Regions:
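Residues forming the flavin
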Residues: 1-52, 56-162, 166-532
Length: 532
């Protein structure tokens, strides 16, 4: 197979990719069997002359002969695909079915691989199936009726179900492509296999997770909703069972824990049961919203649909010399909305979400500042307490009814006069209250944001416009702790307990969590014998 990199094609070119390749490399005319687009990125640095940059795999007749003709082409090389390592099975017998805690990306992929290989896992998900959950979330957003066990954080698909559905990851691993192909089989658009920054949107994610659940069940797995694991039964430092919903006992010697970063009561239970964990850094801040046209103009210089491009994205970083902290954009959602994402009564949490089409006309992103144990303490649960403190203050500022505190950039920066939130663009439901965001974030966060906003305004025109709305608070950027695990991914303090995914501190996003769940299941199978 031949790999071609850095193939630059103007977005206005309408030729077939095969014609483009043969025009660029005439040595390939008549020799091409198949072309696979591995990656397609957008380069808008010289706007409005925007180009796609392709990486391709090309299968040809007489590869050795063709490569001799192309030997001086630095962007063309022979490529040998690295396949995922084959799954091997251990010889330790399983007296009971393996248990999976949580049905987010990590738990879902762990259960999927276990079921595919005949291990018949039982999944316990505290939240509801995606259809019931979607109704509960819509009711919360429209009416402010909150359900602590069925919300944006808990339920089928995990927190990612109500997000932009980004499938980007900095991780490189042969199994990622295999997982992506499964996602396409279950309803994701085929473009996720090659787009530089693929996304599926919350609408397609809901279809995907349901289809994956049905396949797990078809393969002999079981998925139980409204089923929270409330305790572990441990003998001689090893798992022997789990308690479900405070009463039911399920015997098992293997628990794969894919709980999310918002399962705080589960964190407390696991800490009580001596599961090793340590505090780790994360980031907190606010959501900022702009008219999507402002971002499109800055990034592309033209209206994107005229060139067949989607809503523009951005990624921003600011290194603060005064404090040594870093502010950055996080989970940017083009054409999306800011959503209420609480998982507990008495706290306001915001996040971003968009549909596959990204066509709301409003761009939003978290803008956050790093925090760590030096700020909140070194006890494993100190980060949770820190998050709760600022979420509670946001809840009270908003009126103690899940309305969120919001403020314009002009008000936040102390400009006079400054537009009010009522005259700005905002999308958070059930509603916002014009408040001082300095009252629901630590001073060492707000001071950095005050310096970051003008800096970013010099990079994206209009980013720090005084009328732009910011809504608080964003506190769930990543897990506030990390659970220990050894080379086999087992907890060093509780045998048979496998921490995995974002909630355990080993992933940051849908794809990395899915991969961590799959690889954890594969290592588990390498120890335990395949059931007859």
């Amino acid at each position: 197979m031949i790999r071609i990199i850095n193939l630059r094609v103007a977005v206005t070119v309408k030729l077939d990719i095969k014609d483009i390749v043969e025009k660029k490399y005439p040595q390939l005319r008549g020799a091409i069997e198949t072309i696979h687009v591995v990656r397609r990125a957008v380069d808008a640095r010289k706007k409005p002359n925007i180009v796609f940059v392709y990486t391709l795999f090309v299968e040809v007749h007489n590869e050795a002969q063709i490569m001799k003709k192309l030997s001086k082409q630095k962007d063309v090389s022979v490529f040998t695909a690295e396949d995922p390592e084959p799954i091997v099975y251990g010889n330790v017998p399983l007296a009971h079915r393996p248990v999976v805690m949580g049905f987010g990306p990590a738990g879902m992929l762990a259960a999927f691989y276990l079921a595919r290989e005949g291990y018949r896992p039982i999944v316990f998900e505290r939240g509801q199936d995606v259809d019931t959950r979607s109704e509960d979330v819509e009711t919360f957003w429209k009416e402010g009726v909150f359900k602590p066990e069925s919300n944006v954080q808990f339920g089928e698909g995990g927190a990612g179900t109500f997000s932009d559905g980004k499938l980007t990851t900095r991780v490189t691993h042969p199994r990622l492509h295999e997982i992506s192909k499964y996602f396409v089989e279950f309803g994701a658009p085929e473009e996720i296999l090659y787009k530089h920054k693929p996304h599926v949107g919350t609408d397609k994610l809901r279809t995907m997770v349901k289809a994956m659940r049905e396949r797990i069940i078809e393969w002999g797995g079981e998925v139980r909703f409204g089923a929270k694991i409330t305790d572990l039964f441990i003998e001689n430092d090893r798992i022997v069972g789990v308690e479900v919903n405070g009463s039911e006992r399920i015997d098992t010697t293997v628990v794969l824990s894919g709980v999310g970063h918002s399962a705080r009561d589960t964190y407390e239970m696991l800490h009580k049961r001596n599961v090793e964990m340590t505090a780790k850094p994360f980031a907190i801040g606010v959501r900022i919203e702009h008219d999507q046209a402002v971002i499109d103009e800055s990034q592309y210089g033209v209206e994107p649909s005229s060139l067949g491009l989607g809503a523009a994205e951005y990624s921003l970083v600011y290194h603060d010399k005064e404090t040594g902290r870093t502010a950055y954009s996080f989970c940017m959602c083009p054409g999306g909305q800011v959503v209420a994402s609480a998982s507990e009564n008495g706290g306001v949490v915001v996040n971003g979400m968009s549909l596959y089409a990204r066509d709301s006309g409003v761009a939003n992103s978290a803008i956050v500042v790093n925090v760590g144990p030096d700020d909140f303490g070194t006890h494993p649960l100190d980060g949770v307490a820190f998050q709760r403190e600022w979420e509670r203050k946001a809840y009270e500022l908003g009126g103690s009814n899940f309305h969120a505190p919001a403020q314009t950039v002009g008000q936040f920066l102390g400009l006079s006069p400054a537009p009010s939130v009522q005259n700005s663009t905002y999308s958070y439901e059930p509603g916002v209250v014009n408040c001082d965001l300095h009252d629901c974030l630590p001073p060492f966060v707000t001071s950095v944001l005050e310096r970051a906003l003008p800096y970013w305004g010099r990079r994206i025109r209009g980013f720090d416009d005084p009328a732009v709305c910011m809504t608080g608070v964003e506190t769930r950027t990543s897990a506030p702790l990390r659970m220990g695990r050894n080379e086999e991914r087992v907890s060093p303090t509780v045998g048979g307990f496998y921490p995995m995914g974002e909630g355990a501190g080993y992933a940051g996003g849908i794809m990395s969590a899915a991969l961590d769940g799959a690889e954890t299941a594969i290592l588990c199978m390498a120890k335990y014998a395949k059931p007859n």
